[in-house]
Each structure stands twice: as structure tokens, then as C-alpha cells.
């Protein structure tokens, strides 16, 4: 299908030629999933069929656009204004997010625009009103942007349930998913409920390499601050740079370090999710206006607004996930068929290997990604309650509708009925309490027992459960700086200094749940500000790192100092390799140590440490502590472990996991999240919001009550399943044992070269002053000498070869 003449003329006036994938979506008569790189014109491709159809006029809502970011909906609205005005199209484009004024939201329920831009949460809210059939009855198209990102969380499951509801209200609507490159496009199409996959030209390979540094990476640590001067040099040579860092705490620290050495006074911004919304908006506006040379950011900028002036991305710290790295690389050079330029800065010696493995994966276009499980039942519970808010429903019809959603296509009737029973009564142990008696059956229809409950349910819509945060502002009514976690705020005493918003501040008081601060004269923050969960390395990248370390014939791609390190390890002990689980035991400074090189990701290695130390305690071996990384686990104890095999027995580990989890804080934390999403407890109440402490107190009591009186309760089953996949990640431990069936236990007389960096992680704190840094350097030097690692480091040796050895691309 060719463009209508008016649209063809408009493209010509812009100097554009329609891409084949844009025309393919224009021709599509059913659901489509477009896979295209950043800068490939995905958004215009998604809207082009709508604009063509709307040129002839339309009464009511025609196209619904759903994005994971409120900022992106606003940006899309500005971008659409141009063709709408140029082509004189008779349509209105409006957004509907949490930032939309109440008067506008009310008007949209009676007089919706032709194109409405929204988020998954706002869509769920709109579907909960009695007017939903009228609003969405005229709907013809749904555009789902950044679908690859939404599919990785419960927000995507909620969105697919909403899409199923939209199909019921407007049969025949066409859904279009827009996605960056993913590892399994057909699986993502199945997530949509079935769609035709359209592939855009992936474009040229990115220009990606390690950033040359004047100093070698440290043996341990996570900050990357050794490379600050080199990063500043790269920023000065580029037009605009995004510096990605994996955690908020490290982003604050790196930003502070950049400012300390920024002798050229380059304008540099900071952007992460805990900054005040106004502060983030200022940085975004400055980037859009070309006023910043660089911005230090976390995942808050993985998605969103396209800044055409960005010509360099720097990833500080190993990416942990190849797909995330590709997404970040794509933020540079938003021009189709122009290579993106990116540089990587490993934070430590182990991360050098991880970065090289990630570079290989990017060059081979071999992406990682966890297989999606079935649709979560806590999200379904919330969906049932919100469906009841919109009016009575038939259970059989709702079950059929839910099963039409991709994530829930295999949902059993028993699980659906359990969710319906929970939504109605709270379950067996809670059915006697009025507060959980929310639904009742009248004939064949289910509805709200008390229509007034709809208000409370709508106030708690959504699946995002973040750490409870407390606002930070300057004292005496000053401006808002950002947020910190409640648990951190509770630990502060007057005079403590910490980093927030790139500034070192002094804690003054906590007034009405707001942290008041003043400028601090200290040059070093006293304590850390964020305690968020670390991102574990993906399974696919873990396998790549292990395969690279275990095959000396491939070491030519590694920097010379890294090759020397691994060669010494092979002489002293052995190198980890696929098929074998390497473990070492050795004495050091009066203690016995165990190093297990599992390469299973941080969460799984941490769980393994908890299980092994528990078993060692029961055996009287006197474990004293452990530390874990994505690659390995280090345990120290009073007594040696002569035989590791019994401790690593799969059945014993699983039994130990069950005993440990039963009353563990991890389970209570997971239960709290499940209880909030399912609607068991409500954080937002008329007149205010429950504090995190109040919500935790309530869910802890409920968790203990259900364990005693209703151990098979639906929410306990959901909690156990989620804990196993999430923070505990026991599945990665089992996968580790499956791929490494042979235990290679090396009993050494001293610390090994690979174990030495692990020793430096013992007792590390997140933020250190200069004195502690000097002490750490002295300890590191002594430890490296003990491990035989006295060879000279040449910083230039850590640069990646200009032309890496050719490796054939894996067929997907």
C-alpha cells in the first residue's frame, strides 16, 4: 500500500522517504509487532495508519497509545502536533496520566479525543469506570510503545489484561506493538496474544569498545571512579554524552567525582528516579535544548525521549544484561542507518572479562532474556476487583476474556476461581472480616458489595511497588531535593551527611515524614543514601563469561593483565570452566575460606551463601560470614571444610531453602508486595498514604496469621513462587548445578589469584572517605602479593583490540 497523496507530499516536504516497515504497518489488517532499532521511526510507523484513517474524520476515541513513561507520552504528543497541524487533520490529541488535571480527566470520560496517550496504570483506571464501554466502544487502534520493556514486569501483564478488556468492548480493534530488538520476537508476539512480526533493517553495527584509561581498574569495587578523568576527556571530545551507571548510589558518587575534576566547567546533569520530579524535568529540558554536555543517569533514561544531539554513550560498570546494553547504546545517534558510538568502563578486574563478553554478544547480535512465566495471579486479583468497579460481570465471560490475554492463555479455571474467591472474601482465613468482603454474587453476576469501595480500589491501582520513600527538602520550607528510603531516613542522626541530587547535605531533622537538610561543609559524605537491590548478571551473559574464562584459546581477546591473571590462576589452582563447578578452600590470616565460582548472578550466589553457612553452622564448622558477587561466593569460618560435596547436594539445599524461607524477612517482604498488588492491603487511603512502617506492620501480621491458619492461601502460594524467582533466585542455583555436574574441589595452602579480589569485598561499605580508600589500597596491595599477583599493570593493556578476532554470528 502506498501513502495517500497528502501524506506522500508531507513526507517529501520533510525530506523523508517512508521506510519499508512503516509501509508494512500501513498495509497490515491485523495485529502487528514491529521490531526496530532506536531511531528507526517506530513511533511514526505505529501512528501512520491512525493518521491516515483519521484524515476523513472520526467521532470519539480512535487510537489509544500506551507508554511506560509519562514523559514519553508528553513527548509523543508534541511530535504528533506537527503532522496534525501540517496536514490540517480534524483531530484532538491529548494525554491521560497521573499528571493530567482532574478537570481534563473528567471531560475525557464524556468527550474523549480521537487520539489518547496514556500509561498502563491510567488505562486500568479508565477501564474501571462505568463509562468505559462508551469511551472505548469506538476504539479502532491500540499502539503499545516500548513493549519489550513493559513485558519484563507486571505492568506488562496488567496491560495485556487491559488489552483483552478493550477487545471485548471494541471487537475488531487492531493492536500494534513497538519494540527494540529482542532475543525472541515470536515470544513477544505471543505475549500480545498473537501478532504478525515485522522486522525493520537493524542498521549498522555499533561502534563499541572499552574506554582507554590512564589507570587500570581496581581489583574490587563498583564505582568506576578510577576512570573519572578519562570519562571527562571523552565528554569534552563529544557533542553530548549519556553516562549510564547501574545504581542510584553509584550515580550520585560518580556525578560528585566528575564535578570535583571538571576543571573545564562542562555543564553536566544528574538523572535518576529518586530525584525530585522538577529536578528530572529540568535535566530533560536542558538535554532537549542542547544545554548539557553530559548527563549521569541510571535506568531512568534507558527508555524515553529521543535526543538527537547525543553522540556518545558511556557505560560505567559492567552492564549485567546484553539487551539492556544494546538499548543504552541505541540512545546515541538517533539517526537511522548511522552507527551508535559507545564506550565501556569496567569497575573492577572481574568486570573487565564481563565487559569483553558483553562486547562479543553485541557484535554477534546475541541478546539475552529470561523466558516469561505465566501471568501473575496477584495482578489478576487486582484486575478482577477493578472489573467489578466498572459494573457487574459474569465469571465465565471474564474467565474467557482473561484467557485471551497472552500471559494468561494457559490459566486454569481452578486458579481463576481462587483469584475470584480471594477478591470476594479474602480467602478462607479472612472471610469473617468485613473489610475483605468486597464482592457478592447476585444471580450469575458478581459485583461490588459496597459501591463506595470503588474509590479505595482505584486509589491503589498499579503493579509498581517501590521501596517506601521519604521526601528530602531544604530546611525551613525550602525546595524539594528528592527522596530517600524510609529505612535510611530512620537511621539518620543530626549532623550526618549524605549525597542526594549531586549535593552533599547535612541532616537536620525529620518533620512530618519529610527529611530536612542544610548544605554540608564536608567534602566526603559520611554514609550511603540508597540500599536498593543490585541487578544480577543475566544467565546468558554469565554463561558467556564462564565460557571465555574456561577456554584459554580465546584469551587473546582479553587485555594482557587479565590474561596474566588467569594464567597464574591456572598454575596455582584451576580456572572455572563449563561442566565443572570450581571450589577452593584455603587458610588466610587465621581463618578458613571457601570460594565457589558459580557464575549464577548475585541473588543466587547470595542465597547459596545463606544456605551453605546455615548447613555449616548445623555441622559445627563455625561459619563467620560470607560475601557474594555475580561470579562467586566467599565464605570464611573457624574450621576447614574437607568435603564440600554434601553441602552442595541439591536435595539438601532445597530442604534448607524451605526451612530458611519459612520465617525469613525475604518472604515477608515478597508477601508485602503481593498483598499490595492483589488488593489485600491499601497503601493509599482517603486523606493520606500509609507509611512503609505501617504497611509492613500490617502485612507481617497477615503473613503470620495466614501461615498459621490458612497455609494454602492463594497469596502464600504466590509469595513462595515469586521469592524463588526473585530475590532468592533458587532456580539459578539449580541451573548452576545442572550445567556443572562435576565438583572440582581444590584444597590450597594460600589464597588463589581469583579469590583475592573476593577477599576485598569482605566488609566493604558503599561510601568511603579518603582515609579508608588509602587503607583499602594498602590492604589490596598486601593481599595481591599474598596471592602472587605482583606483576606490573599497564593501563594501556586494558584497551580492547581495534579489530577483535572475527567470530561468526550465531543463527537465531
What spans do the regions from the language model cover?
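Helicase motor core with emphasis on the C-terminal RecA-like subdomain
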Residues: 1-12, 17-27, 31-40, 45-444
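Short, well-ordered loop/turn sites that connect or cap secondary structure elements
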Residues: 18, 464-466, 492, 499
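Extended, highly charged accessory segments
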Residues: 399-402, 406-469, 483, 528, ...
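Short acidic-glycine loop/turn motifs at beta-strand connectors
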Residues: 441-444, 475-477, 510-513, 639-640
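Short, acidic/hydrophobic/Gly-rich beta-strand patch recurrent on exposed beta strands
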Residues: 471-475, 518
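A conserved acidic, glycine/proline-rich C-terminal tail/linker
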Residues: 478-497
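Short beta-strand-centered aromatic/proline hotspots
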Residues: 503-510
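Short, solvent-exposed secondary-structure boundary/capping segments
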Residues: 511-528
